Design a protein with these regions (language model features):
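Short alpha-helical segments and helix-capping/turn motifs at coil-helix boundaries
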Residues: 29-31, 90-91, 114-117
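Beta-strand-rich N-terminal accessory domains
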Residues: 20-58, 122-126
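Acidic, contiguous internal or C-terminal segments within carbohydrate-active enzymes
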Residues: 35-38, 97, 101-130
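Bacterial Sec-dependent N-terminal signal peptides
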Residues: 1-21
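Short, basic/low-complexity N-terminal boundary segments at the transition from targeting/disordered tails
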Residues: 5, 11, 81-85, 129
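Hydrophobic transmembrane signal anchors and adjacent membrane-proximal interface regions, especially
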Residues: 3, 20-24, 64, 97, ...
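A low-complexity, Ser/Thr/Gly/Pro-enriched, surface-exposed linker/loop concept
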Residues: 50-110
């Protein structure tokens, strides 16, 4: 019985040290974004297209006068929302643009409890974040 309880406690402790990953794909599912966070590393993101690496694991975060949002960040939540809009531009060849993407909002928290959201948009050919 003690062995089982010890194993459960150890697995709970190790779970908090394991990296958290969130995956979102473009509407055609060829372009894929992976956002990962682990207490031991800086948050990062990587991009693949048809299984081929386009952007290797790159650090994500910033250090500002408000707080350090680069080290020890914990991914506290995320939400994925599909976007499907049509808009018009009169100064380009194709004046009617049909934009489709999947938006990922990642909620991070630093060790001091300060929060920051990072918004990613993954379309069929592009990835953007702010």
């Amino acid at each position: 019985m003690k062995k089982i309880i010890s194993t459960l406690l150890a697995s709970c402790c190790l779970t908090s040290l394991i990296a958290q990953e969130v995956v979102v794909k473009g509407p055609d599912e060829k372009l894929q974004l992976v956002v990962s966070a682990s207490p031991a590393e800086k948050p990062s993101y990587s991009i693949t297209y048809n299984g081929k690496t386009m952007l290797e694991k790159s650090p994500l975060g910033m250090n500002t006068n408000i707080g350090d949002f680069a080290k020890g960040m914990k991914l506290t939540g995320h939400a994925v929302t599909p976007i499907d809009t049509v808009y018009h531009q009169d100064r380009i060849k194709t004046s009617k643009v049909h934009y489709q993407a999947n938006e990922l909002i990642c909620n991070f928290e630093n060790p001091k409890g300060q929060k920051i959201d990072v918004v990613f948009r993954v379309s069929n050919h592009d990835v953007a974040f702010r």
